[in-house]
């Protein structure tokens, strides 16, 4: 698999999703990543530290330039805990948990986050504003309600299926209520 191509596809997808979601500075963005799927393997079976680092470093650069915070979801072996910067955990009141990821418990994306973040910690749960799922890792539990699917410009990064979610406020009030224009869904 060509690393330049994976980096280019990652950049394209992330920039497209950010454009479609219109996230503001300070937002939380969750990443689910299967490096095995990127390489054409089965999720959790052929993890690649190099691919994890390439993708996470690329995404951190893009989000960091916009002031958006990255949370990297781990696999079920760490109860889908997430790596964030300690400052983000404190700012959002997130519960820090005690676990350090490995290649096969947490995964390559979490290991990369520990390598490239300034002061990484694991947290149990978040409610992100949006997120990207590379390899069908199931990020929905970490995106706040109401979740809105986003169709990325590319359907795959490497060989991994790619999906994205954003969120919007709940519509409440019933038939007599009026709602502001929504940037994601037009009423």
Swiss-Prot record:
The organism's place on the tree of life at top rank: Bacteria
Name of the protein described by the UniProt record: UPF0340 protein SPD_0576
Signal peptide region: none
Family the UniProt entry places it in: Belongs to the UPF0340 family.
Cysteine pairings via disulfide bonds: none
Species assigned in the record: Streptococcus pneumoniae serotype 2 (strain D39 / NCTC 7466)
